[in-house]
UniProtKB/Swiss-Prot annotation:
SMART domains: CA (SM00112). The keyword Acyltransferase does not apply. It is a single-pass type I membrane protein. It holds the Pfam family Cadherin. Glycans are attached at N418, N436, N487, N567. This is Protocadherin beta-11.
Amino acid sequence: MENQGTRTQQIRQVLLLFVLLGMSQAGSETWSFSVAEEMQSGSFVGNLAKDLGLKVRELSSRGARVVSNDKKQRLQLDINTGDLLLSETLDREELCGSIEPCVLHLQVLMQNPTQFLQIELQVRDINDHSPIFSEKQMLLEIPENSPVGAVFLLESAKDLDVGINAVKSYTISPNSHFHIKMRVIPDNRKYPELVLDKALDYEELPELSFILSALDGGSPPRSGTALVRVVVVDINDNSPEFEQAFYEVKIRENSILGSLILIVSAWDLDSGTNGEICYTFSHASEDIRKTFEINQKSGEITLRAPLDFETIESYSIIIQATDGGGLFGKSTVIIHVIDVNDNAPEITVSSITSPIPENTPETVVMVFSIQDIDSGDNGRIVCSIPEDLPFVLKSSVENYYTLETERPLDRESTAEYNITITVTDLGIPRLKTEHNTTVLVSDVNDNAPTFTQTSYTLFVRENNSPALHIGSVSATDRDSGTNAQVNYSLLPPQDLHLPLASLVSINTDNGHLFALRSLDYEALQAFDFRVGATDRGSPALSSEALVRVLVLDANDNSPFVLYPLQNGSAPCTELVPRAAEPGYLVTKVVAVDGDSGQNAWLSYQLLKATEPGLFGVWAHNGEVRTARLLSERDAAKHRLVVLVKDNGEPPRSATATLQVLLVDGFSQPYLPLPEAAPAQAQADSLTVYLVVALASVSSLFLFSVLLFVAVRLCRRSRAASVGSCSVPKGPFPGHLVDVSGTGTLSQSYQYEVCLTGGSETNEFKFLKPVIPNIQAKGLGKNSEENSTFRNSFGFNF
């Protein structure tokens, strides 16, 4: 039993395999079914299970169902029986129209495994539609003179059915004049034609009617009918005639649309429709049909579109008058367009030259032509430009003009010109056109550079750093481009001794001036030179300007004491009688300053004194005077230190040291102090300078000596030791400059009474004031020495 059950199971598996193979093969085929249209819903189409060779339960187990691409369920599958049934009534004409055959494509979907079966359902046509004429009545107008055999086309009938159910033939009811003929066209549609069998006579039979029938090929056949009326048309034996065979009219081109241009008129001797006339344009061009319009009944010709004389000057129109019978007459209408001034002149530029060189006269700037498409005075034109321009218009051939320069232009005055060319016609009203053009003037190197100043004054403080920017010169050139690019240079100095190349330099591009080395006011107070400015034109133009450099003084020199000299030797000793009154002039400190201005203004003050309050120094002239009466208690020897200070910023100073001896009289010579003995050898050398300084004031000196002797005779005092004035040997500096006269010997005079130490007699030395002679632009000194003369005087006290 076990073996038998196993064998049975194997047989079932083999059968199932064959079934699956069969279903797979069936899924690749298309199953066709057919059904007639208009069948009720639920009608049987076919048994799917039987056709597929499947059992009904397999359709149920595999969930078989009908699907379609348009999602309309036109078929349904009964899974209990396997029958395909209609889900709705099918209308072939709605589904396929005139397409034959009408086939619907459906699919049967089965699952486990998934499988699609292609189904084609053909919907068969039934004769459910009759032929139909679109018009129930047809009207034919046939002239009575139509020949026998003439064919007249009739309207065809339409049948929604197809195939044998479509229109098959046409028939007409019996009559004595016509028979029906059917024409088949390439798409198998059939058209009826009416053929004249017997000549018509309007007077005998003005009208006849018959029935036109259309039959299809269905079973039973269906038909449709229409009434055909034939109206016999009387013969038209008179053609229309115009009142004039030729019409001519004029119209302005600016006439408004709808304007009446002309009324043409024709008549016809026939009556009825044969006498009714219709007016039309015959063989008219597209321009005529767009521009004019004719009333078919009244013959009025009106304006339909704007006219343009410049496009078309006249129109020739053939008017056709046609009667109801088809006969016609013709007339010609000539329409002349009158020109009006509706077009402004036109300017056409042929060539233009810009920019133009500024120095070229009679240069052609522009060539242009002018025109006005109007006629007569409307087309006559005049051309002009503004009168205040250096240009002129010259007429050339026909309507060509040239715009030329009237005189050489100056770019620096006007770099560009905006020229308005005005063209005006002579119509009424006058129309004009303006053309604006810009003419650029190119530069020519006709202007030399111009300095902003003819001369420049620069101030430089002395002791400047090398390469210091001391100022700038600037020149402008009215030209443009490279002609206006300026290079600066130093011109050779007029003073050949001026080392200009070592003093200043100039930047060739911007005119900046630089000091090449440090300047010294005391050596060079001012110098002049010329600078040149050259443009880069061809040929190059240049100009020059004068530059004056003033060196400003800096307080770089300390005051220098001329008297008493301070050279490290013993200070000079001054003798003051004890009988001197307050304000007695002891001596005068003479100092100079190599600077100038306020830097050389000197002031004096007593810095140190052995006995304060005994002597005083005048601040402005350096005079040392007694401040009070001398007494016996005052020391005989005093040491004074005088400070000499200038007015610079910061101030500089120097000191002068001198000794003062108080004496009762001059009866005994005063021996030189021990510390002054070594300077005796230098006294003679300085004496020469002192004599030179005092020679010019000898008369004043003698007067002072006499006054001094008179005072001494009146007041006798005890004699004091006599000292000598020790003057160091050495020349005075030659670079000293007197700036104001204060504290110097140039405007005040001073003398000194000295006793030589090597003689037992009293000697006076007369000194001439020192007057230095220093040039403004150089260094030097000129000292004049006068011979020293000695006179011996004996004083008995």
